[in-house]
Structures are given as C-alpha cells and as structure tokens.
C-alpha cells in the first residue's frame, strides 16, 4: 500500500481489526520512510449486473436515491432511508456472493420498504414490477391489506 503522505510503496501494517459489523477490515499502517501513520479500510467489492448485462460496483447511495424518489412527499426521514439502505446492503452481502443482479436488489428493497411506508412501497413496486393497469395496483393493495389483517388478527 502506498503512503498517502510521501508516496513510499513500502508500508507496514501495525494493527488489523474487523469493522462495519464484519463486512470490512480496518488496518492501521505505518510508513518507514516518513514515519507517519494512516488507516485504510478494505471491503469486498460487490458487483451489480444490470439488465443490459453491464456490471458496476454496488452503491448503497443508489439504493437510497431510488427509495427517496418513492418516498417523496411522505413522512420518511433521511435516517430511516439510511437504515433501509444499510439493511438492504447487509442482506445482500450476507448471501456471500461477489455479483448480484439489479433485479435481486429490487426484490430485497421491497420488504424493508413495505415496513417503512406502504405508499412509498406501492410507488416503488409499481415501477419495479412494471404495473400496467389499475388491477395491478388493486391486487398489490389487496395483498397489503391481507398481510396487515394477518399480523393484527
């Protein structure tokens, strides 16, 4: 690892420990040339396969941005969006795969979003599942009502 201060290629790891609930490793490093210390963080790169077949690195911020659009005008806080993004990322990373499809990410978002705000869930699901008619909305609303009745009764 290159020293960020003097650009020396030869640095030493002083300490390593798990970070971010085991999804990353923080390393404390020392540079023998300039004797300065710095911290690095290593994470496994998770790739997303898009519908077009292209791949790109996973981005929690893209998930939050997509859900934020569905939540426009709804009483959903930024903290709640951040927590949803974290839950989705943790769920996907817990599968232990190096590559995930954008479709799988969408499916993973639906559950936590339904718990967060049902209207935002309907908005997101209508785009994600390509609702084409009023009947699609009615069917989804009926499922939401049935779930609510089952959990209350």
Curated annotation (Swiss-Prot):
This is Transcriptional repressor NrdR. A zinc finger (unnamed) spans 3-34. Belongs to the NrdR family. Keywords: ATP-binding, DNA-binding, Metal-binding, Nucleotide-binding, Repressor, Transcription, Transcription regulation, Zinc, Zinc-finger. Binds 1 zinc ion. The gene is nrdR. Its cofactor is Zn(2+). PANTHER family: TRANSCRIPTIONAL REPRESSOR NRDR. GO terms for biological process: negative regulation of DNA-templated transcription.
